Every structure is written in C-alpha cells, then in structure tokens.
C-alpha cells in the first residue's frame, strides 16, 4: 500500500470525497461507521475524522471552532449534530476542548464510558483537597440531577447571580470530562442544555460500568483502526493517551498482535498497524461432469457383459 492509496481510503470512509452527509440517516450511518469524530479540525492535526468535513464533503478550508460562528455551513452542521444528540444516536465528550466536541457513536459509547466515566455514576461528587471537583461543580451536579435537563442560563439563575458564566463553564467542564453530565440539546435563546448521563442514557452507562478496561480498550482500538485503515503504533498510543495511560494501550496492542487480530502492513516504507485481513478461502472450481452415452448395440450384436446363450441341442447331451 502507498501513502496515496491510504489517504484515498480514508477520504472515502471519512466522507471527504464529495459525498456530504445532509440527512439524519446519513449522519447516523457515518458516525456508526467511523465510531467517533471531532466536530471541527484540531490544531495540531489529530488523526480522526471531523463531522464538519463529512457534512461539507471535503477537507478544503474547513472552519475551526474559533471561526465557526462566521461560517453558515457550521451552523447547519451543528443543527444536524444536535439532532443526533437528541436522538441518543451520538454522545458528546469533553476530550480535547469544550468548544470542539468529541462525538461518539451510540454503539461505541459504552466502551468509551468504561475508560473515562465514573464507576459509581449516581454517587454525587464531593469537593475537597483531594477531589477532582470544585465546590461549584458539586453544586452544579446536584442541581442538574434535581432539575435536569436544564440550560446553562437557568443554572446560573438558580445558583445565584454572583456565579459568572466562565466559572460555570469550568464547573461543567469538570463534570463533563468524567462523563458525569452530557450536553443533550442546544437552544439559541438559552444555550446548551445539560442532564446527568445516568438518567439520559441509563442502558449505555450500565453497560459501560460492567465492562473491564481491557475489554473496552480492545474494542475501541479495533474500531479506531477500522476508521483510520492503518496507523503507526506511536501515533495510535498518542491518540489513546489522551484518555488512558499509554502503557495500557501498548499492552492491549501487544495482546491483539499475539492473537493475530492486528498485524503490520508496509505503507511507503513505514510499518503500520492494521486489522488483520480475513483470509480468502479459495474454493476450487468443480470439474465439469463427463456425460457418457451408452452405445446402442448393433442389430444382431449382443450387449456388452452378456454371455452368449448355450445351444439347447448341445446342453441336452
């Protein structure tokens, strides 16, 4: 395989080949095929598809999240993405930047939750010197659990006017990064609408809690490799290192290589990981039947295999 062939395969899978997604059915099918994607391209570039690129059908002059407000295409793509959130066909995670959502397909989300989410999701977080949550984040969680789904604007009103939007954004980010809460809708008049994840998607959370880290990581590694076609192992470890220890990624890759579920492929002189292709079973073509015709005996000739009858005149002697 050459670099050009690899890039072409990715463009087709990531819908950058002039075939944009415009309907909710197309958007759902795209996300299920790739597993996960960013909403907008990231700088420095990250080897993962983007929803805006699939919506436009090209990677030419795609807007970043900082410039999305000036691009009418971004508003249309966001509207389609929010419909996926409402239908629970996609879930949004705060993996890289709160303004650039990481979208995860419904089928892949339980595995992602097993790596990132809380194992006891209904237990309210507590503030403290050793806690990962601020006091404001704990207050916001209790409010969302009590009154959610609830908009950020409404939250500020209930928590008190002294709470600024930047401070509230930070608190929501703390909860979101651990998948305590999730963005479920967006209203132009009120902004983002939030709910606790265990109530919004109870089945997905329950399944994720029941998965082991190794099982979840193995499934996501396979899905990611299917998405990118082939990737150098170092780049694979960098990507997954954003949400799990790289040593665990390396161990999972070695286990998949030992099981021959992954293998190496040479791409323009570089050694890359890929999902091991299925062996093509060659079935030999059946031999044509040889039809043999039975010859009719000539007149007066005896058929083959029959002995001539004895003359009764001689047998009586």
What are these regions (language model features)?
Residues 1-317:
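Long, low-complexity intrinsically disordered regions
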């Amino acid at each position: 395989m050459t670099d050009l062939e690899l890039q072409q395969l990715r463009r087709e899978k990531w819908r950058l080949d002039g075939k944009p997604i415009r309907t909710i059915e197309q958007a759902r099918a795209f996300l299920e095929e790739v597993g996960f994607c960013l909403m907008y391209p990231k700088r420095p570039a990250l080897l993962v598809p983007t929803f805006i690129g699939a919506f436009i059908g090209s990677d030419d002059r795609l807007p970043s999240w900082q410039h999305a407000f000036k691009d009418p295409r971004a508003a249309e793509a966001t509207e389609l993405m929010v419909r996926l959130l409402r239908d629970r066909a996609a879930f949004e995670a705060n993996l890289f930047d709160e303004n650039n959502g990481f979208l995860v397909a419904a089928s892949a989300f339980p595995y992602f939750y097993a790596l990132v989410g809380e194992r006891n999701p209904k237990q309210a977080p507590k503030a403290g010197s050793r806690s990962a949550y601020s006091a404001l984040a704990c207050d916001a969680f209790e409010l969302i659990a009590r009154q959610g789904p609830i908009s950020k604007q409404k939250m500020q009103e209930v928590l008190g006017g002294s709470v600024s939007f930047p401070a509230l954004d930070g608190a929501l980010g703390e909860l979101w990064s651990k998948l305590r809460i999730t963005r479920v809708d967006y209203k132009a008049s009120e902004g983002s609408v939030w709910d606790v994840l265990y109530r919004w998607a109870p089945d997905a959370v329950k399944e994720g809690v029941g998965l082991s880290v190794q099982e979840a990581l193995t499934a996501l590694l396979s899905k990611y490799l299917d998405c990118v076609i082939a990737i150098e192992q170092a780049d694979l470890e960098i990507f997954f290192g954003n949400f799990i220890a790289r040593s665990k990624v390396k161990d999972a890759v070695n286990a998949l290589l030992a099981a021959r579920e992954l293998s190496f492929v040479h791409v323009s002189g570089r050694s890359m990981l890929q999902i091991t292709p299925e062996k093509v079973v060659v079935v030999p073509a059946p031999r044509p039947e040889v039809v043999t015709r039975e010859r009719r005996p000539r007149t007066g000739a005896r058929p083959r295999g029959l002995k001539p009858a004895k003359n009764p005149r001689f047998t009586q002697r």
